[in-house]
């Protein structure tokens, strides 16, 4: 009995010691100018901007996992597409009169040009090294079948020729030509099937995880930058002087510390919403989140991989979210080519792949529960789509693959669970709540804290998204001559549009291609194509989009 009592006493003393150590550690306050929460591409990009704009500012980055770029930025957890609307048909919706709207496509392409310039600048500075390790030329293709879809693609191609950003795109309805572009897609296909494709040679495959690792490795070379891994934010509290005290737990030894920061960026992917809510700023009350995961079929068989060099996107079926369309993609991951097909939607209440099953429930509040209910009621087709995706069998997924690769063999493919994407639900005065595709920077009025919510186009537009954040929270500094000069050195086209300026477009594409080691030839005259037959479109209920 005495031994048991002694043992219990020793355990109590030990636990008390750990608790006291944690409190003591928490009382030791670390000070920093900028706190970056999350070790993904958004935090890495913002940190890289600020390092060049204000090299004397101290920065601290905290990451919950044991390494950076292990969640959504990880190359295996996303599609690795340099989203520039060259092939993604959801960025060019069809109007009621049958015409094609290209405004969104132009905006997406402009944004990706900023990312290309940002990365090229970092290569020139030696921050990013060996461009082939993170970006490679992979042609981007759109591929459709059926008379209505062919007519849509024909009209899309014609509309995009109005923009200097889409020069060099080619169009074909010829089976032999499309087979030359994408053999896997055409071999074994019915020769009588009506098909069409566009192809743009300057498309890219991007390893965002590698970019993130290299950017953070460069930041770590400076003494006023600190990276803390296995560190989870437990509390955020605004101080009277508008600084923030952030409590961070060390997940390895159980201790905690307080970090006092002048500015806090929440770039924690799916976890950003909960942390934004934890901050208590009123702007957070407008938002809720709904998690959707994605799966891909993966082939590493050389007979498959070496027979396909393209990212091929199709058109979503009627009633399905526009971004849900499957695509068969060449990827370059860790120096090795693979082919991915998907995505297939999955559901989990986790907000992160390495998150908690309680994430959805714990982020639901009295402020956002009604917007969530409105979104569910207003988008029943989306709910049905997600349920149908979750119910897919192995055979169902393989049949979907065969629509894009008719001669596919089951033994060449395995299923891979990619990352989680938290869709933005925002309070709306008219509808109660709306599902928002895209990313959104949410900040307080004082510009002392900001969070990035949303999922698409995400990593491919990290550079322009963080530019937007700088303008939103550091407006006075951004307008200063010093910051203006630095930003224009980082992004030569900063402050002006490339669209409509052929010379400027070609100059920037030539520059970034040379620095990043990408293929680029001056575009030739556009292909002659049959004139699109614009047909009035039946009025259809708008389908909410989601990012997979």
From Swiss-Prot:
Pfam families: Mqo. Keywords: FAD, Flavoprotein, Oxidoreductase, Tricarboxylic acid cycle. Its EC number is 1.1.5.4. Its cofactor is FAD. NCBIfam families: mal_quin_oxido, PRK05257.1-1, PRK05257.1-4, PRK05257.2-1, PRK05257.2-4, PRK05257.3-2, PRK13339.1. PANTHER family: L-2-HYDROXYGLUTARATE DEHYDROGENASE, MITOCHONDRIAL. This is Malate:quinone oxidoreductase. It comes from Escherichia coli (strain K12).
